[in-house]
């Protein structure tokens, strides 16, 4: 009886635990089912996209690799340029990059200043349209006479009518050309010439003659500039957009 009692007592005492275990098991199953409902395979349209994840990782690694290679090439180019600069700058082996670049900038400024002061570059045409006239008197000791000359400079855009306009001015003023020099660079031109006025003598007002010559050359420059402006405006109208605009404008007016 004691054994029977103990057995029954054990079974009775363990009954709640058995029931409790079964409830926990059911609860765990329901929680797992809810977890599966939240992340079911149908929500992904099939199996979990492991291939897509692998492909994304490979793509990211490829982009990172290409970025590292591009950065390496950029550093190599910079280092090669710095090496070339070190060869041009004396005693630059111990200079860091910032000091090297500062030294190069200073040398470039010095070279630019020397080039601007060189007489070779002073005769080059400038961006501004200008006319200069400088009268000079040359004495001839043998004949005991003075000759008046004009050193003139004419700078403008390189236009075909510039020469003809200058020739017209010189012919009108009866000036003799002793020397002429034409320099054309980058669509600009400068004409330096030395002129002689055979009609001038010691009683001639040199300043008035120089002023008249400069005024005539300035008038010629204005004609050349206006002609250049008209030509450039005609060339601009030849663009496709403006041709379309003008044609549509005229068609509406008609």
Curated annotation (Swiss-Prot):
Stored InterPro entries: AIG1-like (IPR045847), bHLH_dom (IPR011598), HLH_DNA-bd_sf (IPR036638)
Keywords carried by this UniProt record: DNA-binding, Nucleus, Transcription, Transcription regulation
PROSITE patterns with a match to the protein in the record: BHLH
SUPFAM superfamilies: HLH, helix-loop-helix DNA-binding domain (SSF47459)
Main location: nucleus
UniProt key word Transcription regulation: yes
Entries under SMART domains matching the protein: HLH
UniProt keyword annotation of Methyltransferase present: no
Record GO biological process: regulation of DNA-templated transcription
Molecular function per GO: DNA binding; DNA-binding transcription factor activity; protein dimerization activity
Subunit structure: Homodimer.
PANTHER family for this protein: TRANSCRIPTION FACTOR BHLH30, TRANSCRIPTION FACTOR BHLH51
Protein name: Transcription factor bHLH51
Organism: Arabidopsis thaliana
Gene field: BHLH51
